[in-house]
Amino acid sequence: AANAVELQRALGPAVYSERLRHHFETFITEDDFRRIAAIGFNSVRIPVPWHVFGAQEDAIANIPAIDYVDRAIEWAEKYKLSVLLSLATVPGGQGDSNESPTTPESTADWHSSKNGRHVALTTLEKLAARYGSAASLLGIELLDSPVVSVRKNIFTMTDGIPAHYLR
């Protein structure tokens, strides 16, 4: 499977959800944050999906990941690390980490639909509200690796996304 949608279709919602939960519990631990700080790094980048606060559509059986982000923020503060949160996926996909099923004709079209823009901005607003005052927050990346060559309707972007980000 090339992405979360295809993986869920292959495994089924129950198995997919259990594997995702196991991944969240074991992939990154407090010990990783301790070791990162111990070797002298001062920051971590945490990719978050558009559904970090829980499922927002029926297409994919998502479990909320926000508790794991909360935990990572706490660990970062404990080990004096800065955190860059990165919106890593959006409905419709934005490029290499496309959430949509992959086909030779598939394109990143999150910005072409009002819903895609709304979901992206709503998720960013919720992240800012939740972590904006966190001592460890370095920033929030608006979108991870958007592919320039597939942008459509670029001038219909929702207010709030700076024009320089679209260059």
Language model: regions and residue ranges:
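Non-catalytic accessory regions flanking glycosidase/transglycosidase catalytic cores in CAZymes
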Residues: 1-42, 82, 122, 129-133
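Aromatic- and acidic-residue-enriched carbohydrate-binding clefts of CAZyme catalytic domains
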Residues: 1-19, 58-65, 93-114
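Glutamate identity and glutamate-enriched acidic tracts
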Residues: 6, 18, 25, 30, ...
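Aromatic-lined substrate-binding rim segments of carbohydrate-active enzymes
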Residues: 22-92, 162-167
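Active-site region of glycoside hydrolase catalytic domains
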Residues: 93-167
